[in-house]
C-alpha cells in the first residue's frame, strides 16, 4: 500500500524531499510522484522515481480523481485492484484536498508503506496521518530557505476619556460689617446775660411766659443694595506631559543546532547574543 508523505510546490522541492527519503533507506522503486504537471522529465531522471500523471478531476469523461487515487494507492505489484477504499492508507476527507493540490499543479510524493526502512518520514507538510511529523531528513538542495524572525512591538493608541468635571455655583454667606458714621445732633445750653438797662420795651412782669427750642439730631437709616464686586471666569486649556508605560514583549531569535559534522559554519554565524 502507498501513502502520501508530502505535497510540494516545485520539482526542486520534490527532488530534495525524494533525496531525503533515499538517504533514510527508501529505494527509488518505493517512491512515487503524482502530479498534473508535464515538466517532470528532469525530476524522473534526477531521482529515478516514477512520476504518475494525474487526470483532470473536472473532466467528466475521464476517470474521477477519487477512483484514480483509489486505483493508484491500492494496486499491488501485479497491478491488480485487491484493496477496497476503506483499506486505503489515506483519510477519505483528504481526497478533496489532494484534488485541489493537483489542480494547482503541486506534486504529491508517496511511498510504499511496506518498504523495509527504519522509520516513516514526514517533511512537515504531509497530509496523511500515517506518518510522524519528525523532521529528521538531511535534504540536499541548492535552494536557499528563509525563516522570518518576528518580534512584538508596542503600539500605543490614545483616546479621550472624562476623568472629572468642575461645577461652579454660588452660595450666600452672612458676615458682620462695622462702620463709623459721623452724625450731628443738637445740644442745649442755657446762659444768662446782662442786657442794656436803657431799653424800655420790656413786657409786664408775670410768670406765664415760656420759650420752646426744638432739639434735632441725625439718626442713621441703614439700607442694603447689591453691587458687583468681582466675577469668576472658568475655562480650560490643554497641557501635555509624558506618561511612562512598561510592557513585556516577545522576540524571536534564531537558534542553530548542529548534529554531526557540519562544514562551513562559524561558531556562531547567527550572532546570537
From Swiss-Prot:
Keyword entries, A-Z: Stress response
Q: InterPro entries from the entry? A: DUF2382 (IPR019060), GSP17M-like_dom (IPR025889), Stress_Response_Assoc (IPR052967)
Ranges where the record places region Disordered? 241-273
Coiled-coil segments on the chain, per record: none
Q: Where is the composition biased (Basic and acidic residues)?
A: 241-264
Q: What induces it?
A: By phosphate starvation, via the alternative sigma factor sigma-B.
NCBIfam families, alphabetically?
A: YsnF/AvaK domain
Protein name, per record: Stress response protein YsnF
| Lineage summary | Bacteria, Bacillati, Bacillota, Bacilli, Bacillales
Amino acid at each position: 500500500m502507498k501513502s502520501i508523505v508530502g505535497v510540494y510546490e516545485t520539482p526542486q522541492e520534490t527532488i530534495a524531499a525524494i533525496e531525503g527519503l533515499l538517504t533514510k533507506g527508501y529505494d527509488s522503486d518505493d517512491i512515487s510522484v503524482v502530479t498534473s504537471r508535464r515538466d517532470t522529465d528532469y525530476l524522473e531522471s534526477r531521482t529515478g522515481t516514477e512520476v504518475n500523471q494525474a487526470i483532470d478531476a473536472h473532466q467528466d469523461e475521464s476517470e474521477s480523481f477519487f477512483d484514480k487515487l483509489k486505483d493508484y494507492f491500492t494496486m499491488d505489484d501485479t497491478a491488480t485492484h485487491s484493496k477496497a477504499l476503506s483499506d486505503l492508507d489515506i483519510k477519505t476527507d483528504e481526497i478533496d484536498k489532494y484534488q485541489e493540490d493537483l489542480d494547482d499543479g503541486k506534486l504529491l510524493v508517496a511511498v510504499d508503506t511496506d518498504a523495509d526502512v527504519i522509520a516513516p518520514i514526514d517533511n512537515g507538510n504531509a497530509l496523511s496521518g500515517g506518518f510522524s511529523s519528525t523532521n529528521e531528513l538531511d535534504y540536499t538542495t541548492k535552494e536557499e530557505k528563509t525563516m522570518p524572525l518576528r518580534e512584538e512591538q508596542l503600539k500605543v493608541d490614545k483616546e479621550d476619556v472624562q476623568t472629572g468635571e468642575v461645577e461652579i455655583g454660588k452660595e450666600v454667606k452672612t458676615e458682620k460689617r462695622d462702620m463709623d458714621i459721623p452724625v450731628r445732633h443738637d445740644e442745649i445750653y442755657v446762659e444768662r446775660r446782662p442786657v442794656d438797662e436803657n431799653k424800655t420795651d420790656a413786657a409786664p412782669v408775670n410768670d406765664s411766659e415760656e420759650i420752646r427750642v426744638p432739639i434735632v439730631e441725625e439718626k442713621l437709616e441703614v439700607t442694603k443694595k447689591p453691587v458687583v464686586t468681582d466675577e469668576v471666569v472658568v475655562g480650560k486649556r490643554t497641557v501635555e506631559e509624558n506618561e511612562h508605560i512598561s510592557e513585556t514583549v516577545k522576540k524571536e531569535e534564531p537558534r542553530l543546532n548542529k548534529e554531526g559534522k557540519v562544514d562551513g559554519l562559524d561558531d556562531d554565524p547567527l550572532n546570537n547574543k
